[in-house]
C-alpha cells in the first residue's frame, strides 16, 4: 500500500469532502484498512486523512495537491513530427475514393468487346482500307437471317452485298442523298441500276458467325462500273462468298439508260481499283424460257410495300426469293445454291404482277443441279433472267469457289 501511495499523491487536508456526491470524493487518499465489526462485516473510514508512510516515516506533499482541468488549463503537448501528421483515416478514405474512381474510368476505356466485328468497327458502319479504295464491314449472322438448315439464306448474303455497297459510297463522301448518288448525279436525276450480278458461295455462315465483307469498284466498259465483293469468316479467314456486278446509269424521271457524264466520271474514277474481277464473267447466253419449255411455273407474285427501295422499284434481293419460288421443293430440301447469275432486263414496280418460271438446264455438269430461270410480268415482259447451280448440302469446301484469292492486293 505504501508503494501505491507514491504513484497516487493525496491533496492537502484542507479540502473538504462532500460524501454522497459523485465527482467530489475525499480530498485525501489512503489505503482502506478493514476493521472487524460485531456482525462480521467490514467498517471503512470515510475521511481517512493520515499521511502516507514509507518505511515507517511520514511523507508530506506540497499544499497545492493535484489540480484538475477546472483549476487551470493544461499546457499543449509539445510539437512533434507524429502529432503534426494529418488524420490518417481521412487521408486513407480520400485515397481509396480516388483509386476507385480511376479504376472505374480505366475499365470503361479499356473494356474489350466480345464481338469481333466491334474491335475495329465500334458502330457497325464499316471503314475504308488500302488508301481508301476498299471498304470493309463486319456482320454478325442473326437468328432471323438463317433458314431451315440453320445457315444464312442467300437473301441475307445479297442484303450484305447491298448494304456494304451503299455504305462504301457514303463513307467515300460521294453520297449526296444518302442512298448512292453523287452530287453530280443528283443534279442530273441519275441513279445507279444493276445490270448483271454473279454470286458464288463456297460455304454459308451459321447463326452467331461473324463475317467480313470487303468491296471495291472498278471501270466496266465505257459507261459502266463494276463492283466486287469478298465475304470471309472473321475467325478463320476462309473465303465464303465471291460476288461481282455491273452497274449502269439511268435517268430517274425518264427511266431510260444514260451515259456517264464527265462531271460524274471525275467524281467516281479516283475510287476505281485496277484489278481483275473476283469471278470470271459467265458470258453464256441464257436461252429463251416460256410456258412450253418451263418445268415449273409460279404465278400471281406481287410486290409488297416493304419490297420497294427508295427509287420505288423492287429491291434486287427480292428477285432471288421470287426465282426460288418455282425451284422444285426436293432440290431446296436436299441441295444448296452455290452459284447464281442474274441479268436484269427492266425494273418492277409496285403494281406489277409477276410469274416465276424454272427449267432444268440440260447443259449442266457435275453432281449437282442446274436451272434456268425467268421472272416476267403477266404480259410477258422480262424482268430478270438467271441461271443457278446447286450442290448437295454440307458439301462445304467442295463447292465451286476457287481457293485462290482475286482481290486488289493486300487490303488488310
Swiss-Prot record:
Subcellular location: Plastid, Chloroplast
GO terms under cellular component: chloroplast
Keyword Chloroplast: yes
InterPro entries (alphabetical): Acyl-ACP-thioesterase_N, Acyl-ACP_TE_C, Acyl-ACP_thioesterase_NHD, FATA/B, HotDog_dom_sf
Endpoints of the signal sequence: none
Main location per the UniProt record: plastid
Coiled coil regions, renumbered to chain: none
Active-site residues per Swiss-Prot or TrEMBL entry: 311, 313, 348
Region listing for Disordered, in residue ranges: 1-78
Catalytic activity, as annotated: tetradecanoyl-[ACP] + H2O = tetradecanoate + holo-[ACP] + H(+); hexadecanoyl-[ACP] + H2O = hexadecanoate + holo-[ACP] + H(+)
Entry similarity comment: Belongs to the acyl-ACP thioesterase family.
Main function: Plays an essential role in chain termination during de novo fatty acid synthesis. Possesses thioesterase activity for medium chain acyl-ACPs. Substrate preference is 14:0 > 16:0 > 16:1.
Protein name: Acyl-[acyl-carrier-protein] hydrolase FATB2, chloroplastic
Native source species: Cuphea viscosissima (Blue waxweed)
Encoding gene per record: FATB2
Amino acid at each position: 500500500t505504501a508503494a501505491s501511495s507514491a504513484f497516487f499523491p493525496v491533496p492537502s487536508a484542507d479540502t473538504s469532502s462532500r460524501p454522497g456526491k459523485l465527482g467530489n470524493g475525499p480530498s485525501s487518499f489512503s489505503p482502506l484498512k478493514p476493521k472487524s465489526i460485531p456482525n462480521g462485516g467490514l467498517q471503512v473510514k470515510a475521511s481517512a486523512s493520515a499521511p502516507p508512510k514509507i518505511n515507517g516515516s511520514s511523507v508530506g506533499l506540497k499544499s497545492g495537491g493535484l489540480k484538475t482541468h477546472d483549476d487551470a488549463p493544461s499546457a499543449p503537448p509539445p510539437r512533434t513530427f507524429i502529432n503534426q501528421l494529418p488524420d490518417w483515416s481521412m487521408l486513407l478514405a480520400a485515397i481509396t475514393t480516388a483509386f476507385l474512381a480511376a479504376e472505374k474510368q480505366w475499365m470503361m476505356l479499356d473494356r474489350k468487346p466480345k464481338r469481333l466485328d466491334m474491335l475495329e468497327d465500334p458502330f457497325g458502319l464499316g471503314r475504308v482500307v488500302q488508301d481508301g479504295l476498299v471498304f470493309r464491314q463486319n456482320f454478325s449472322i442473326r437468328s432471323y437471317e438463317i433458314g431451315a438448315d440453320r445457315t444464312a439464306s442467300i437473301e441475307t448474303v445479297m442484303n450484305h452485298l447491298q448494304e456494304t455497297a451503299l455504305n462504301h459510297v457514303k463513307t467515300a463522301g460521294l453520297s449526296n442523298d444518302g442512298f448512292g448518288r453523287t452530287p453530280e448525279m443528283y443534279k442530273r436525276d441519275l441513279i445507279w441500276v444493276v445490270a448483271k450480278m454473279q454470286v458464288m458461295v463456297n460455304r454459308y455462315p451459321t447463326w452467331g458467325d461473324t463475317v467480313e465483307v470487303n468491296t471495291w469498284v472498278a471501270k466496266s466498259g465505257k459507261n459502266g462500273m463494276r463492283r466486287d465483293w469478298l465475304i470471309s469468316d472473321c475467325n478463320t479467314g476462309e473465303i465464303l462468298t465471291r460476288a461481282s456486278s455491273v452497274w449502269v446509269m439511268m435517268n430517274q424521271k425518264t427511266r431510260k439508260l444514260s451515259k456517264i457524264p464527265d462531271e460524274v466520271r471525275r467524281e467516281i474514277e479516283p475510287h476505281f481499283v485496277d484489278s481483275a474481277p473476283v469471278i470470271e464473267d459467265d458470258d453464256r447466253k441464257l436461252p429463251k424460257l416460256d410456258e412450253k419449255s418451263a418445268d415449273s411455273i409460279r404465278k400471281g407474285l406481287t410486290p409488297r410495300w416493304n419490297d420497294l427501295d427508295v427509287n420505288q422499284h423492287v429491291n434486287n434481293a427480292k428477285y432471288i426469293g421470287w426465282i426460288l419460288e418455282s425451284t422444285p421443293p426436293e432440290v431446296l430440301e436436299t441441295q444448296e445454291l452455290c452459284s447464281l447469275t442474274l441479268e436484269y432486263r427492266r425494273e418492277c414496280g409496285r403494281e406489277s404482277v409477276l410469274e416465276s418460271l424454272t427449267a432444268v438446264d440440260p447443259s449442266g455438269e457435275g453432281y449437282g443441279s442446274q436451272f434456268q430461270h425467268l421472272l416476267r410480268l403477266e404480259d410477258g415482259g422480262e424482268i430478270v433472267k438467271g441461271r443457278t447451280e446447286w450442290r448437295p448440302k454440307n458439301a462445304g469446301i467442295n463447292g465451286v469457289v476457287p481457293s485462290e484469292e482475286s482481290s486488289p492486293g493486300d487490303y488488310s
